[in-house]
């Protein structure tokens, strides 16, 4: 069943004669608080004049919770989040004056709340929260009956008080709202530039670091920039900064390893270019390190140039004082004129025998 706004029963607004005015108004100095019958009635005009003369009290300032479309001529159209001042109240209706527009008229009392309250703050920030405070459907502002039939409804309510109580309870039901909590929940980096389009959106630039304060809406996050400004940005436009740092560290480690390998290969190539094309003398070979002899055959397991393939009995040369990899020797094989790694246990200095 659609939720319909309460219908305020108006009395007939006939022009009051001087006699009726004198009859309705009390003696001078004691102004009565009679029932309001419309924005153009004598009582209404007198009450408005008194309120304006004495000034609007701070307690009269209210915030509109829902959009309201007038059904009759003495009602006022208001929008959610608009500020108004209440001049007086009649049952479920209040006569208000807009702070900006200065227009006056009736709105339902349940459609407004005092300033600096939870409901008022949610109404001012139209997006807070997006899912938990859905806007009222348009059908709620459609009048139940025409103006001519309102008197008949009033008579029916007098005969059936139980029905009136149930309707009143239904009209007082307000949507449930939870507090909009803002707590730091991690730093993020902006992946794409976003330009604010709504009053609660926040413009951010690509590469900027922000702090996430609320993630209740899966599509929009409430964030804070480094300058303290807060607002909504699309959730898909930001990414956790911690994950980015981990990726950057991994990439830096890989780049460092690639650099070391490239330097090793360049050093190997430069040494090979400096070697003579023919065989080297014994004195020249000793510049490559200690003379060793292979005890076993070894075949390189990787297709790159970091390992040597040698056979048992081959002579190799290695600088035993400058080895960085445990269990391996960086050696030079004169037979193949190449540098590479061989297992340390596969070679040893040749045995010297006395004659």
Swiss-Prot record:
Palmitoylated by app. Gene3D superfamilies: SH3 Domains (2.30.30.40). GO terms for biological process: establishment of epithelial cell planar polarity; establishment of planar polarity; negative regulation of hippo signaling; positive regulation of proteasomal ubiquitin-dependent protein catabolic process; protein localization involved in establishment of planar polarity. It is found in: Cytoplasm; Cytoplasm, Cell cortex. Keywords: Cytoplasm, Lipoprotein, Palmitate, Repeat, SH3 domain. The keyword Repeat applies. Residues 57-117, 183-243, 287-352 form the SH3 domain. Its main location: cytoplasm. InterPro entries: NADPH_Oxidase/PX-Domain, SH3-like_dom_sf, SH3_domain. Disruption phenotype: RNAi-mediated knockdown results in reduced spacing between the anterior and posterior crossveins of the wing, reduced levels of subapical cortical dachs, increased levels of dachs throughout the cytoplasm, increased total cellular levels of dachs and suppression of the overgrowth and dachs up-regulation seen in ft mutants. One of its GO terms (molecular function) is cadherin binding. GO terms for cellular component: apical cortex; apicolateral plasma membrane; cilium; cytoplasm; subapical part of cell. It comes from the Eukaryota. Interacts with dachs (via C-terminus); the interaction is direct. Interacts (via N-terminus including SH3 domain 1) with palmitoyltransferase app; this leads to palmitoylation of Dlish by app. Also interacts with dco, ft, ft-regulated E3 ubiquitin ligase Fbxl7, F-box protein slmb and SCF E3 ubiquitin-protein ligase complex component Cul1. Required for the apical cell cortex localization, total cellular level and full activity of dachs. This is SH3 domain-containing protein Dlish.
């Amino acid at each position: 069943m659609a939720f319909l706004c309460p219908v305020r029963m108006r009395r007939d607004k006939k022009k009051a004669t001087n006699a009726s005015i004198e009859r309705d108004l009390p003696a001078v100095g004691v102004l009565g608080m009679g029932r309001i019958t419309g924005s153009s009635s004598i009582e209404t005009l007198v009450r408005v004049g008194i309120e304006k003369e004495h000034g609007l009290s701070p307690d009269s300032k209210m915030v509109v919770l829902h959009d309201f479309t007038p059904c009759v001529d003495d009602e006022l159209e208001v929008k959610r989040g608009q500020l108004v001042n209440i001049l007086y109240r009649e049952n479920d209706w209040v006569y208000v004056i807009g702070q900006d527009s200065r227009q006056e008229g009736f709105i339902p009392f349940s459609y407004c709340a005092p300033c600096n309250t939870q409901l008022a703050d949610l109404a001012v920030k139209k997006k807070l929260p997006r899912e938990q405070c859905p806007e009222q459907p348009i059908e709620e502002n459609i009048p139940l009956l025409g103006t001519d039939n309102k008197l008949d409804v009033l008579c029916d309510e007098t005969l059936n008080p139980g029905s009136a109580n149930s309707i009143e309870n239904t009209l007082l039901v307000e949507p449930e709202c939870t507090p909009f909590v803002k707590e730091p929940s991690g730093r993020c980096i902006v992946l794409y530039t976003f330009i604010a389009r709504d009053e609660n959106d926040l413009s951010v630039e690509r590469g900027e670091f922000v702090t996430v304060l609320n993630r209740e809406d899966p599509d929009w996050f409430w964030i804070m920039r480094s300058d303290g400004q807060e607002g909504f940005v699309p959730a898909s436009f930001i990414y956790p900064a911690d994950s980015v740092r981990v990726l950057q560290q991994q990439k830096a480690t890989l780049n460092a390893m690639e650099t070391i390998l490239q330097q090793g290969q360049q050093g190997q190539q430069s040494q090979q270019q400096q070697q003579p094309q023919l065989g080297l003398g014994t004195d020249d070979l000793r510049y490559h390190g200690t003379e060793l002899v292979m005890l076993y055959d070894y075949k390189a397991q990787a297709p790159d140039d970091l390992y040597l393939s040698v056979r048992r009995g081959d002579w190799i040369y290695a600088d035993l004082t400058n080895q960085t990899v445990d269990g391996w020797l960086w050696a030079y094989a004169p037979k193949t004129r190449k540098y590479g790694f061989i297992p340390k246990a596969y070679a040893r200095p040749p045995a010297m025998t006395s004659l």
